[in-house]
Amino acid sequence: MIMETDVKNSRYYLNRELSWLQFNKRVLQEAVDTSNPLLEKLKFLAITSSNLDEFFMIRVAGLKHQKENGVKRRDIANMTPTEQLENISDACQKLVAQQYMHLKGILKELETEGLVFIKPVDADERQKQWMGNYFEREIFPVVTPMAVDSSHPFPFLASKSLNIAMLLEKNERDEEMDEENDIDVKTAIVPVPSVLPRIIRLPDVSEANSRHCFVFLEDMLMFYAARFFVGYDLLEARAFRITRDADLYIDEEDAQDLVVEVERQLKKRQRGQAVRLEFEVGTSRFMRRFMTQEMNLEKEDMYQIDGPLDMTVFFGFCGIKGYNHLRYPEAHPHSPWSMLDLKRTPETNIFDMIREKDLLIHLPYESFDESVVNFLYSAANDKDVLAIKQTLYRVSSSSPVVQALEKAVQNGKQVTVLMEVKARFDEANNILMARRLEKAGAHVIYGLVGLKTHSKCTLVIRREKDGIRRYVHVATGNYNASTAKLYTDLGILTCNDRFGIDASAFFNLLSGYSDPPIWDSFIVAPINLRQRCIELIDREIHFAKNGEDAHMIAKMNSLLDKGIIEKLYEASQAGVKIELIVRGICVLIPGIPGISDNITVRSIVGRFLEHSRIFWFRNGGREELYISSADWMPRNLNDRVELMVPIEDPEIKRRLKQMVDIELSDNQKAHIMQADGTWLKTISAENQLCAQEYFQKIAEKRDAEDEMTLAQKLEPYTPVLGHGDGSD
């Protein structure tokens, strides 16, 4: 008999950081997936690098602080900060080596398409002449070489900046010094200007030539380095890159003005402690020792790079004109299915549609502009709308959402916005947007002390013939027009009275001193979301112990909360079938005999970033479905304001169940977690089904067809969920 306390044993949990690195490895695998176009494979390398940058700036930096402060506390997997850092370094060294091995293969493939990266020394005479002129005209005036000696201390180098370290010696040395073997070696740093293009296209031999050559800016700088140090011989020149701690340390309790304090901390971000040094392969021991000593780094913080440093440079290159055949076909968001059959006359507005039925929006396949932005602009311009209230966590830099809110203020609406200024790496943009809204005349609040407001909710108050009506939008993803084209998310537009009453109470809780109400539909963190999730799992345990069919499915970005995982293990032991779809971190281990036999975990990594959270519980045949802004992580359940809402509309429940069904049937982009914590990608040659492609095809083809009829015309999939027994 398995003791309940067994589920607390650390051997049943993975380390958070190593689990995240496994996720980034899954992203890296897309760079060698032959189903992806060539430039998209290159983009996945850039994504992997961007992910690693943030990982070091936040997660590794935090662990280094713990180590320096003597913290010995063990994590969920029984690892100390020091042990975690050692394991992270080993895993990252292997991951980076794989990255650059894959890059070499992709660059060779690009050569067959006529896109060739060369070193300046390998350029022909015509190209070298052009490079020399370009260097003198465009580069030399901008670059500032900096000596490093007793009168020139090692310069401050910004996080993620690219630099060149150089060793020099006088080309006319003192003979006595030569006799004594005391060569006077100088060191210098040349920052690679970020204001100049990093990838430089060389002129083609002719217009008809199909071979296009490119060089990296740092290679050109090193090729012409002698121009900066007249009278010196160049002994060595190597590119290197520093990553610094970028977390913000904000004391909200003592801060008199939160926005001012965030701005103050943002100024410190670029000057954080160095946490990683990347340098070119072939860098001498003397140069490595020189750089690590100056930046107070250890051996485990050093990464030797066999290729161009910072692959995020390829984000821009992947958009090169004239090579559409090397990219995904352009994906255009389509009209939301829920709205198609409601567009009857030009006079029909979105409020008419919502009154007729709840609307489901499935991003990025369905249009954010036609749904959410339309909803906000309609509210801004509608003479009967009295007020708009909205939470904003991340918005795009030229946000149509903010523009709609500004328009609403101009039209005399009461506009209240909770702008979360602590959204990591979006702090500056959010502060800018908040000040724009304040200047327009909106009421802007900045959340609750000690909590990030991560929920996605909009409330529109409208006067109608039969009285005041509340229109509500709740979603799993941000009000960000840019990421709405890249992330898979779900949103609901409704005028359900229970949602409306709860939404009013929710905004009162955020803006004033109101005590939490007794919620009718909303489930709110950190108030009762954790408790409700535990209750829902307990209910399935009850059914299983009574011999009934017990089944639950949860889709999220990350699974980290130990309390939730212990409950999932308990449910598995009781016989509950548990299917988890987790894109990123998952410290739960499935398939452990006697502990998690009934749990499976899959992760879908593809063209779009899986971001929606869906929770399905069989509930003895009376199925319940929820969507949420929250993952099952301590920060979401304890330290953030989050929302989870039940899905009540039968049509939306049916559609959501079909979505989950298809994702559980994906056999092209799904990775299955094994009982040893590793992941295995599933690729089937028969009955191929890629969930993201499937949803895209439906969005493209269903304008005049019933969705279920259309589904029969697409690739078949095997249903996983039972759709009978009172499923609606």
For the regions a protein language model found, what residue spans apply to each?
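Cofactor-pocket helix-loop regions in the catalytic cores of large enzyme subunits
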Residues: N557
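Glycine/threonine-rich ATP-lid/beta-loop region of ATP-binding domains
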Residues: K562-I565, Y569
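N-terminal localization/anchoring segments of enzymes in phospholipid and broader phosphate metabolism
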Residues: M1-M552, E570-A574, C586-D728
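Hydrophobic alpha/beta core scaffold segments
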Residues: K577-I581
